[in-house]
Every structure is written in C-alpha cells, then in structure tokens.
C-alpha cells in the first residue's frame, strides 16, 4: 500500500485498525479454528485518554496443547498513523506474547497483569525489552497462587508466530 492509499483509507475508515488487523491475522493463521478470548481495557482507563492502562487489551488463544498463548495489543501502532507509516518500528516495535501452562479461567489473570506491568514500565521509562534480556524480579513467585518457583522472566522471540508489519 502506498502512502497516498494509506492516507485515503485512514480518512475513509476512521475506525480502521491496521495494526490490530495484522496481529489478529497472524494469530488466525497459526490458530485457524480458535476464537480467542479477548480482554479489552476500558477506553477511559487507557493512558492515551488520561488513564493508567498502557495496553488496549489482550487475546488469549487455546492452542489445543497444554498451554494458552497470550498476545498484547498496544505496544505496536494499532491505529493509522502517518508518522508511523514506513517507519522502521511501529511504536515500540513489538507486541508481547506469553505462553502459560494453564487456563486463565482456572488461575485468574496473573499473566495479563504481569504483561500490563511490563507495558507500563516500557511506556513510563522508555526502556523496551529485547530478546536475551532477563528480568530478575524481587525474588518472590510470579504466580504465588499456584506456588510457582518462577521468580524472573527471560525475554525471547516468539517461536510460534513470526514477526509482522503492523503499519
């Protein structure tokens, strides 16, 4: 799509979300028969409107295996932006994904809360995450309800859904 075509579509379709569409298409390709469970932040809670939520939401995919695959919405440019069109990175240049070994319905939304905290950190400090990074945490369990011994995070590229262009 050319810059002119992009601008025309942006004007003609004010609720167009090319970044979100691209993310959904990538996950639909990987999980073609799965309808994700979506969690959206309230519009008035989003940082863009004065709130403290830096993500628009999450989608949780049942993989048909022994884990759920979660993707965030909001670390990359979701909505049309002439400034982002053709740029090297779309907003922060990535969405976060996480694979968790149990259903969010069984254990609450701890993984979504953790991803929201990581997004808040990035937006407030300007520090973003790259593959190979390690987040040590404070020594306490990331999931105390389950009695997990995991106390930190290793940042890796998603091996299930390949990187995509969102703008």
Regions found by a protein language model. Name each.
Residues 1-167:
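Short linear motifs embedded in intrinsically disordered, proline/glycine-rich low-complexity segments
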């Amino acid at each position: 799509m050319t810059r002119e075509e992009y601008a025309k579509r942006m004007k003609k379709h004010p609720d167009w979300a090319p970044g979100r569409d691209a993310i959904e298409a990538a996950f639909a390709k990987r999980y073609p028969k799965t309808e994700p469970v979506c969690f959206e932040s309230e519009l008035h809670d989003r940082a863009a409107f004065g709130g403290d939520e830096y993500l628009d939401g999450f989608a949780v995919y049942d993989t048909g295996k022994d884990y759920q695959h979660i993707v965030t919405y909001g670390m990359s440019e979701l909505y049309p932006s002439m400034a982002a069109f053709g740029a090297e990175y779309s907003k922060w240049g990535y969405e976060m994904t996480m694979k968790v070994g149990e259903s969010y319905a069984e254990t609450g939304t701890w993984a979504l809360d953790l991803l929201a905290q990581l997004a808040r950190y990035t937006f407030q400090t300007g520090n973003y995450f790259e593959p190979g990074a390690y987040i040590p945490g404070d020594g306490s369990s990331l999931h105390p309800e389950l009695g997990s011994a995991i106390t930190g995070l290793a940042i890796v590229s998603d091996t299930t859904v390949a990187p995509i262009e969102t703008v």
